[in-house]
Amino acid sequence: MTDFISSKAANDDMKHILQKDELIKRIDTCLQMTSLPRNIYEPYIARPFQTSGFFDELSPYIQIDSNGYILIQYERGIQMLHKRTKVADEVIYWILEDTIFLTTYIDMMRKYQVDNIQTHLPNDPSIHQQIVDRVNESFRAIGGLYEQWHHEGKRASIETPAKK
């Protein structure tokens, strides 16, 4: 029954394009299920929807139009990804992946009292493992399709440019 409901919800999302506020609300609801510090992740939830200014390296950006969502990513100021989807869950998942990793990394920087400018996290396998574990723990807390996609590595396919 749960599979039918989530399948039906996914089909409904394909027919109805969710707007920025609804996407942000769903992302926030997912993040509240985790143990991640809200004061760190909260400023990053709306960032993917900004339309001007400085675009962070390799971070997700989203434009919404009547045909769906445009997934955008910049590297060194150059747009490297411009891809369409009609699936709101892909947008939510993509933003969750970025926000969860970023929040975990910033939290680790605070724990080790580094600023990532003059001081950096030690290049230590145990630090890397703590980050991986915390990201996995966050997706486990969220569960469902987003946890499945995380373990399948769906972010890589989302960030692969569409064939022309």
What are these regions (language model features)?
Residues 25, 29-33, 93-97, 137:
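Charged/polar, solvent-exposed surface patches and flexible loops
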Residues 5-9, 40, 62, 69-73, ...:
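A generic structural signal for ordered alpha-helices
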Residues 51-79:
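Short aromatic-glycine-(Arg/Gly/Cys) micro-motifs in beta-strand/loop hairpins
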Residues 85-104:
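Ampiphathic alpha-helical segments that act as solvent-exposed interaction surfaces
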Residues 2-21, 104-164:
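Intrinsically disordered, low-complexity, charge-dense segments enriched in Lys/Arg
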Residues 80, 87-89, 109, 113:
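Generic alpha-helical propensity signal that fires on short helical segments
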Residues 1-61:
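N-terminal "first-domain core" detector
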Residues 17, 82-85:
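Conserved aromatic
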